[in-house]
Amino acid sequence: FIAVLLGGSILYMNSSIRAEQTAEKRRTEFKQLGIDLADASDYLTDEARKFAVTWELLHLNRYWEEINVTQTRDNVISRLQELNSPDEELELLAEAKRNSDALVETERRSMRLIMEALGYPEEDMVYEVATFQLSPEDLELSREEKLEKARDIMFDQEYDDDKDSIMDPIAEFQEIMNARLEAELEVARKATT
């Protein structure tokens, strides 16, 4: 009888340890996904701002490669859905993604202003930049005014506020997610003691 009881205890303990390890692994992955989303947003901002200042096509190309090829923001949200993240957490990241998509419009405008000022024909522009329609006011600006406007809109208070509208939901996601996963981990830890 004691051998059966001891065997059952060992199986229960092993199962509890695995549950704790799984909870810790989930917490680590969720945390990394939140970091990845914030980093992707920062990367896009950095590349768009570098292009606005240096006019180097390398930065423009890196920006659009992240959006169209690497797609970190979309991949993070897809992975969180696969992990059955709670709706509240997914909605926060969806809000951050929507706000990020809206900021892309400001960045496209800046890029288009630069490409226009530098005399690039539309067929030599990245599709997303070529298809951005500048306002009549933007079109009337001189070369120098276009370059200045392109820089200004990438560094003004409105841009910073828009950037905060991306990072704030990500920070809230991380707080809620950390609390939830810490609670899951604590339950798993208690099962091993």
Task: Please provide the spans of the model-predicted regions.
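N-terminal alpha-helical signal peptides/signal-anchor transmembrane segments
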Residues: 26-52, 70-74, 93, 100-103, ...
